[in-house]
A protein has these predicted regions:
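Short, structured segments at the rim of ligand-binding sites
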Residues: 2-430
Length: 430
């Protein structure tokens, strides 16, 4: 049933009735991390035994990777937020363009398929329309482990008789590359040392699952990770960490609307950077306990500059929602995007709502405060969609967003959660 509900067209529309003095108030439960569950699902390819995951968010990307996993030979059962998945044998080594195009994270099956099956054929990714995300770092690493990799007709074809441990230094930080190579090295011969690894909590979460499966990994959460390959991995149960990007989005919603929101089921130390920035802009944020925070927005939002960078820096996934917040701040902010090129698709749409923003290369110069008014706008990717929903909340009158289905890729019950806090958002039937 979940699959049917979530097989949504990304061109769906949502209507928001906003107002300048909207205050969001209440409690919201944060879901499991999308960017953690995708690699952990891919990791089930490394064993014949069953992997059980809890706190799984029911978002479209999860259903996309599960469809891909079924094609590769997986059987799964999904019950609310609990997923049981098993790949007794690999039925196909090909991840087709149709599915990889729908979600770039499908590249995460490349390493596990190769490590267990000796060959993998994975389409070059499509996914979000936000600039280039090179797969070269993944390919280079697999070659160093002894795989022969060719690019043919839009597919990455990798083969290896055996994979031998080695030292691999990533040219630049890569979350997917780190994840792919940690998984592959877990079933390689001997010792692999990965240098300049990504520090994201989602990478650590994957490593924690691999440990439970029997992998030998040292340096989890550090820039240098050491893996001693084992002959085989087994089944395991694992709780997915909370989604720090969803949590950050709701913190911004509270700050933006002079709201009073309590977030539960979180890991507060996973988004310290956002908390610091929001406090600087005037929000009051209190830690209630290890798993909950309260945000109280202030009447005056203070402008500030941000520069995106890899964890523990300011996350690129929160750049668009933060830009919306800065349209309501007094003064000028400079938002610099260093991770992805072309990640300013939300800006033209914010202009339609009345924002004052100028793009100069990798910078967006936001002049506030702008009184926003509702209009018809379009979202081209997941985080842009979230930013535009937030803008619609504080724009007077009706805002209709096309491309709202992008939200379903990464936010579980986004409108429902916002409506429970006092928003007025409705999905429109095409």
């Amino acid at each position: 049933l979940g699959y049917i509900i979530l097989k949504l067209n990304s061109m769906e529309k949502i209507r928001i009735l906003g107002r300048h003095n909207l205050q969001l108030k209440g409690k919201v439960k944060i879901s499991g991390a999308k960017n953690s569950v995708l690699p952990t699902i891919a990791a089930s390819l490394l064993t014949e035994e069953k992997i059980q995951l809890k706190n799984v968010p029911l978002v479209k990307d999860v259903f996309t990777i599960l469809t891909l996993m079924q094609e590769l030979g997986a059987e799964y059962e999904l019950d609310n937020d609990s997923l049981s998945i098993q790949v007794k044998r690999i039925r196909s080594e090909e991840a087709s363009y149709e599915l990889v195009r729908a979600m770039r994270a499908s590249i995460l099956v490349l390493g596990p398929l190769l490590a267990r099956h000796g060959k993998a054929v994975v389409s070059l990714p499509g996914g979000c329309a936000i600039g280039s995300r090179p797969t070269d770092l993944h390919i280079h690493g697999l070659e160093k482990l002894g795989a022969s990799v060719n690019l043919e007709h839009g597919y990455i074809k990798a083969e290896a008789k055996s994979l031998e441990g080695t030292i691999i230094e990533f040219e630049k930080k890569t979350v997917g590359g780190t994840e792919n190579l940690v998984m592959t090295a877990s079933l390689s011969h001997g010792e692999t040392i990965l240098k300049n690894c990504s520090l994201e909590p989602e990478v650590s979460d994957l490593c924690e699952l691999l440990l439970k499966m029997g992998a030998k990994i040292e340096g989890i959460g550090e820039e240098t990770i050491r893996i001693i390959g084992v002959k085989e991995l087994g089944g395991a149960s694992h709780n997915i960490i909370p989604d720090r990007i969803e949590a950050s989005t709701f913190l911004i919603a509270g700050a933006l609307t002079e709201g009073d929101i309590v977030l539960t089921h979180i890991k507060a130390d996973h988004f310290d950077t956002i908390v610091e920035k929001l406090k600087f802009s005037g929000a009051k944020i209190d830690k209630l306990d290890d798993n909950s925070l309260r945000v109280i927005g202030s009447q005056e939002i203070k402008a500030q500059d941000i520069t995106t960078s890899s964890y523990p820096g300011f996350p690129t996934d929160i750049q668009a929602p933060f830009t919306t917040l800065m349209t309501q701040a007094e003064g000028t902010s400079i938002i610099t995007e260093t991770i992805f090129d072309r990640r300013f698709s939300h800006v033209n749409e914010l202009l339609r709502l009345g924002a004052n923003i100028e793009i100069l290369g990798d910078k967006a110069i936001v002049k506030g405060k702008s009184l926003l008014s509702g209009a018809e706008i379009i979202a081209t990717d997941l985080r842009a969609a979230a930013a535009l929903v937030l803008a619609g909340l504080v724009a007077s009158g009706e805002t209709v967003i096309s491309g709202a289905g992008h939200l379903d890729r990464g936010y579980e019950k986004f409108e429902e959660k916002l409506n429970s806090l006092g928003a007025d958002i409705k999905r429109l039937e095409e």
